[in-house]
Amino acid sequence: MTKRLAIGAVAVLLALGLGLAWLALSSRSELPDGLPGGVVFVSDRDGSPALYFRRLPNEPERRLTFGSEAVGEPRVSPDGSRVAFAMNGRIGVVTLASGEMSVLTLGVDWKDTQPDWLPDGRRLVVAARRRVGEPASLHLVEPAPDGSVARRPLTQARGGDDQSPAASPDGAWVAFVREDRLMRVDLDGGRLTRLTGGFKRDRSPRFLGRERLVCAWSEGKKHGIDAIDLATRARQTLTEGGVFYRTLAPSPDGRFLAVTRSWDSGVPPFAGLLGAPKEEVRLLDASGHERGRLFASRRHANHSPDWGR
């Protein structure tokens, strides 16, 4: 009995030692030089999820939104001066320089989420639903100088949500996700076109320059990120494996991706007992290789990055 207890204790200590060594190695992160712009992200480090901003490469992080109400899904305006975000069915906007916040849509007639700016920096496309439980469609919202907001439906959802809108660089159309496929809708005329098919379940489309889309995907137990040529619809796999990336955002110069890394099937099973990180923001290069952690914690989640100038 004593011998079995001793062997068990040694096994536990060995597992703990291996776990601590793995965590120490996995927490090392040296970011590459020359990272452009700044990143807005969501963190619950101070309680409710709030927006934070960090000018890269090494300025201190700064909180942008305050209060007990959870906010999320930030999108930086084309000129880098403002951030649109979702807040309990409403769309808010915060100015980066001053922290001044305004509410764009009130969440009364429509519950809005997932804002994305058009290139003019004035209009936004959002995922909107009448009430909780109904499918979301895409709407174009246009603020007026008098404070009113015009709204025009772009899509009519079928069974599930039309979600994750991404406006094209020329402002002529919007990419989005419908039933795990990438779609496009033209702002002028509303013509719908399917962009992807096959077995991959796509999510989080973003434009990588004017000629490509980049998106995360899952297929069975595999997950990855693909770049899609808009002219030929050819897919190039940037990364594939057991790491689940929930969202992604290209840098302004297209050399990097800021991604929400949700989990990794290759993480040792004992890591969770030792305080493995929660959802975190990682840096990938344009080839899909991880280059380091941007925002990570073993106590608080960090996620949903968007890159500004």
Give residue spans per PLM region:
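Sequence signature of WD/YWTD-type beta-propeller architectures
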Residues: 2-309
